[in-house]
Amino acid sequence: MLRKKTDGFSLPLQKGPFQNNGATPWFCELNIGTPGQTLKFCFDTGSNFNWVTSSLCSDDGCQHYANGRFMFSESSTFEWIDQTGTTVDFGPWGSMEVEEGRDKLCMPIQKELDACLFISLYLSKKYSGIQFDELDWDGGIGLPSGEVSEVPLDKLSGTFRLAQSHEGEPTHSHFLLDLMDKGFVSKKRPFISFLSDMSEDKSARGTVSFGLLDDAYSTSLEYLFLPWARYREEVPYLWSSENASISVGDNLIGEDLYFTLDSGSSAFKGDKTVLKKVFEQTTETSPVVSISLTDSAGDEYGLLEITSDVYRRDIEEGQHKGQSVSQFQWLKGAEDMLLVGSVLMDHLYTVYEYEEPSDGQLVPKGVWIFNKPGGSKIIQTKQKEPASLFDKLKAK
């Protein structure tokens, strides 16, 4: 167990085959339970709960590509919280029947040294569907913006990955806040970042960092800051920014959208009317898709240009294997949403930033995105000064 306080740490990410289910192929191998059982977890900024495929599932149930499950009865540190059972919404994927428990999760943050937390999480006992079949990981760790919905449980949206208690409280404590409370991450460094190396797909590697920043981007002028804005009262935990529009070539397709970066997803998803049109216009031809971001005064502060080599992906396993598919998917009930995950994030350095914690709470500040040196020039806007994000490190 790591005892010395640290500024932060990084964890290696591995990439599974790209599948057409809308979920990221990236995962981190973590140990859960005592003795530790190694399973594949996604660090998911598009959900507000923790979960794992478990031995509650029948022998032929909970089929998924990663094919791991937590054998909770073999862990001496596992504790039940609630065995009455509940249903967790996975949006268009359907739902998952779960029970709730608590156990030790250990992360390899240094050679031969682990950081361990006791976390609450849902143990799945039933799920089904083609999307789950194609899932490259065994469970997820939610990294929400920190906002909590005040909408009654029975009024919550069925479009996004979310869970909430009947009292309107967060179902599970915030993972980053837990890391801070244990001294694994400095409270002066309230950020989470994702960076992947796609130079050789077969050996693709990535990194998720808590409290640490990549200094290679400290002098970059090719970046944007996307200030956080609440998409809907019932799903305030999403990392969204308002006033986005999307065009295909010179054709404006949708405006007044909430642009959301979701590390648990892969494809562009959202508003049915908008995303259906974008998909149709990018399937047979290869136009540039552009996303414009404007401030409250209507002035553009950011422009992204996404070429077909970014938005069209070769499907490596599962349904449509061997095909090249435009990664724009529409969701029922996701009006005014433009969400994207690894399809775009693989080409950017992405940092989720909070305000410094106060009274045991985390408040979202926004998301920083940077072009990779030598990579695709997705961000067309060039800034006059380097990102102020790095001032936190200089002030230390």
Please tell me what each predicted stretch does.
Residues 20-136, 290, 295, 299:
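Signature of the N-terminal lobe/flap region of pepsin-like aspartyl proteases
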Residues 283-291:
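Loop/turn-rich, solvent-exposed surfaces of beta-rich toroidal or solenoidal domains
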Residues 292-396:
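Aspartic protease catalytic domain
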Residues 48, 57, 126, 146-148, ...:
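Conserved beta-strand elements of beta-rich interaction domains across eukaryotes
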Residues 36, 111-114, 199-205, 296-301, ...:
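Short, solvent-exposed loop/turn segments that connect beta-strands within catalytic domains
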Residues 26-77, 105, 140-144, 158-161, ...:
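Aspartyl protease active-site motif detector
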Residues 1-21, 111-252, 366:
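Aspartyl protease catalytic domain
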Residues 1-38, 86-99, 130, 216-255, ...:
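Pepsin-like aspartyl protease folds
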